[in-house]
Amino acid sequence: EICACLVGSEMCIRDSLMDGLSAEKAEKFVGMLETMGHESPVEHVTFTFGIAGVSRSLLAQITRHRIASFSVQSQRYVRKNQFTYVTPPAIAADEAAAALYHQTMEQTVQAYNALADRLQATYYPQFLAEGCTEKAARSKAEKKAIEDARYVLPNACETKMMVTMNVRSLRHFFQLRCCNRAQWEIRDLATQMLKLCCEAAPALFRHAGPACCQGGCPEGKMTCGQMAAVRERFAALHAAPSTAETR
C-alpha cells in the first residue's frame, strides 16, 4: 500500500516510478507527504471491508460517504422470513425495554410474512394468465411480493455489505465516525475498521482517528468534553502491536 502511494506521488516529479523504491523510503516519504498536506497520492491506495451484523440504520449513515463503493445485500430479492436484527445496547440493558423491543420485532416478522404471502397469492394467477409456467409464475410472484412487503421492515433489520474506500476517504471517515458524537453503531464499526487499517498499513494511518486527535475539537458547543480521554484511547489503539498480514 505504501509503495502504491509513493509511486502515485513520484509519478508527478520523476520519469522512473520504481527506481530505488524500498519500504523504508516509502514510509519516510509518506510521512513527508502527510506533513505537507499532500494527500492525493494516497487516493491510489484502497481498502475493502466485508461487513455483517449491522443495521439498515447504519447503512443509511455509511452511504453518506460518497467517495466509496458499496455492495449491499438486497431486501428486494432476499426474503426475510425470520430476519436478524440489531439491538441497541441501551435497550438490551433495560429488561422491560428489551421485552417490548423483541415483541415488536416478532410482530414485524409476522406482518412482513403475512404481507408477502398475501401479495404472492395475488400476483401468482396474474403471471399464470400472462402465460408463465407454474414455476416461473411462482418465482416472479414471490419476488414482486417481497419487493413491496419489505417496506414494513425496520431500521434494526440486519444487513451485509462490501465497502471499498481509498486512504484519503478513510481518514476523513475516521475523523467523523470515530468521534464520540457519532451514533454508537457506526462509531464502533469505524473504530474496528481503523484498527484493521493500522495493522495493515500503520504508516498511512498513524494519525487517523477522530478530528480531536489531530487538533482541537471542531464540534464547538456540541463537544463531548472528553477530548483528553479520546486522545488517550486512540493513542493506545495506534500503539497496539500488529497482528494482521499486509496484502
Annotate the PLM regions.
Residues 1-8:
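Single conserved hydrophobic/aromatic residue that forms the stacking wall/gate
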Residues 11-12:
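Active-site loops and adjacent core secondary-structure elements that bind or stabilize anionic groups
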Residues 23-33:
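Short linear interaction motifs
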Residues 32-143, 152-155:
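A glycine-rich, charged low-complexity "G-patch/RS-like" nucleic-acid-interacting patch
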Residues 110, 114-117, 121, 154-158, ...:
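Generic secondary-structure signature for well-ordered alpha-helical cores
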Residues 126-128, 145-146, 203-209:
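Flexible, glycine/charged-enriched surface loops at secondary-structure junctions
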Residues 163-247:
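Long, amphipathic alpha-helical surface segments
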